[in-house]
């Protein structure tokens, strides 16, 4: 049994570097073959020759019949079977141990090279000229050989050597030869003994005088052992076939895919290098859009907010509300009488008339805001002052009726007339509105129609009034009247106009 233990230790080392099916096969070999053969079979087959008897007294006839019945003992036959079947596994184990030893040597040499390399780095300038430099050169020639050998088996994360290359081929040959040995020993057992032992064996080999009967001890027990060992051999054969399928197809496909994957990085490295070189070319395009987005949207927003109110009066038709008129502060523009045709339009009015470009989001008109209570109260207070002024104008009209009508056609000094009112709100400067028709008024004595020059003045003032009254829903119509030159006190008129803070003059009437 000492020899069996030595074989068991060797097979245990091989089990560490085997597949799952290979480990199962080794377990079957250990338990159902070696242990059973060493524990029970020798005792059962121990009296094989001593208890073999024949019914003859002829010397030598019994030995000749035993040799014919059992050309080789079953115990020895099974021992040979175990040895032959285990031999391919032992060869594979030897290959693994060789690889392990080569790896250990490689590591030792690499450590030596690292130590020598560190020493050469410290005294590199003198090492190139000294004799030790040649030795260092030889050391530098070793790493390429070692790098080539590192491509052979490599240990996995569990510390086992991976099957690949020559090691994988060795393992496949190991399985194939084990299968062949199993089949050969099963067939040999069938031809040598068969699968059953009969209690009586007839022998007619000389020197026996005639056919003699020989008797075998414990034939039934021996038959059971034969069948048991045959079943174990069949199980081992089945495991070998499964392992051939597992390695012959799966592992070979893995080897092909692994070789293909090892070759692919070499081909894929060139596109990676190309993309790496093209990165500086592709980086500049994203920069210009960033500059455009930061500068473009900033000026658009204030323009839309400033221009949006311009569209409000355009979307709706002009209308006149019957609300109290609003007074205007005095302005410094020239009177209408000093111009033959029409007063000059201020520069800011021309700016309002010119169309201003509006961006796309401004096309939607905004609703006209309703007047607030503060604005309504303001105009109510102004209406009271205007009513007092109208009373004064009525008195002036009565006095004008008493004067001769010829004086009405006299030219009035330009200083009496008020210039064009100054615009209060910036919206009035920007909104050009359609001119209203000429307005006529009838006095108590005579009716006067507005001249062409005054009509143009009314057109301008009508536009200004519409632009002024549109957002607050209130209009103010001004009628020009002529005063008598002698009956009206200019001081009184100027004081009244200043106290009421209105734009009306002695020759104007607000209706």
From Swiss-Prot:
Disulfide bonds: 54-214, 61-208, 65-203
Coiled coil (residue ranges): none
Main location: membrane
Residue ranges with Basic and acidic residues bias: 110-119
SUPFAM superfamilies the record matches: Connexin43 (SSF118220)
Localisation per UniProt entry: Cell membrane; Cell junction, Gap junction
Annotated TM spans: 20-40, 72-92, 175-195, 224-244
Tissue-specificity statement: Detected in eye lens.
Membrane topology, record value: Multi-pass membrane protein
Domain of life: Eukaryota
Extracellular topological intervals: 41-71, 196-223
UniProt key word Membrane: yes
Bias kind Low complexity: ranges: 403-415, 440-456
GO MF annotation terms: gap junction channel activity; gap junction hemi-channel activity
GO terms, biological process: cell-cell signaling; gap junction-mediated intercellular transport
Intramembrane annotation, residue ranges: 2-15
Keywords, in A-Z order: Cell junction, Cell membrane, Disulfide bond, Gap junction, Membrane, Transmembrane, Transmembrane helix
UniProt-annotated stretches for the region Disordered: 110-143, 397-511
Pfam families: Connexin (PF00029)
Family classification: Belongs to the connexin family.
Record text on subunit structure and interactions: A hemichannel or connexon is composed of a hexamer of connexins. A functional gap junction is formed by the apposition of two hemichannels. During early stages of lens development, interacts with the C-terminus of MIP.
Purpose of the protein: Structural component of lens fiber gap junctions. Gap junctions are dodecameric channels that connect the cytoplasm of adjoining cells. They are formed by the docking of two hexameric hemichannels, one from each cell membrane. Small molecules and ions diffuse from one cell to a neighboring cell via the central pore.
Protein name: Gap junction alpha-3 protein
